[in-house]
């Protein structure tokens, strides 16, 4: 009897690929949309016309965020934009597999046109030391003034330092010496909604109907099956992802929209803004010259006044 290779059968290929695809889907799809960097896949611009940053569509809870930038910068200069995403590092979040883990953070920085991520060879050594191994990305190839980062460990990076290069209006005619706004959005922890509208397991799950809970089946990694017998005798099975902590048990009566689980979310998303002035060196030099002339004029005025007082005193003595 002739032996045939396992891979010669198309059916065997399908059997082999199904678990690989499933593993890939669980590892990369479930968690990936929870951070600002993945807004790139769904939105051309991360900031809506209303001023709302699109990360808030998936991160429904709120949390504080702050940004620190210099008040003024000169053209073609590297400076720091510090984004602060504070939270209690002792708390744990529910991961996609239902286990508990630390929180990650992410941020999107919206700079004025012309400002961009500083090239590595332009970043001073002291700023490089602060940045460490962080990898920043432009939001898209044609939007280099929009930067994203994440997910990164929140326990290490509650402050994210972006190295920014200011434009030179003498070279880039689209830039001007003006005061500009800077916007930032930052999150800690996973989101509550995926871009397709489905809920993550980082949510409260409510009863789909009024009735009685007849069964709660723990399918381990696959989550839970909660069966409800409604008032008209029909049965509804609600699938709840892994990691849920139930507020109800078998035999309990529930009403429609009544919470079945606790709220596991410990993270949140926030927005902040700042201002920066792109200063013209020639204007500053002109201001210094003007101030020098004013001081010089004041000195001459004082000297002239003293000279006049001496003349007046001499005439009185005469």
UniProtKB/Swiss-Prot annotation:
**Job description of the protein:** Component of the cytochrome b6-f complex, which mediates electron transfer between photosystem II (PSII) and photosystem I (PSI), cyclic electron flow around PSI, and state transitions.
Residues where heme binds: 35, 55, 58-59
How would you describe this protein's topology in the membrane? Single-pass membrane protein
What is the scientific name of the source organism? Chaetosphaeridium globosum
Provide the protein name: Cytochrome f
Q: Where in the cell is it found?
A: Plastid, Chloroplast thylakoid membrane
The similarity annotation says: Belongs to the cytochrome f family.
Set out the biological process GO terms recorded for this chain's protein.
photosynthesis
Cross-referenced HAMAP family: Cytb6_f_cytF (MF_00610)
Q: Which residues form the signal peptide?
A: 1-34
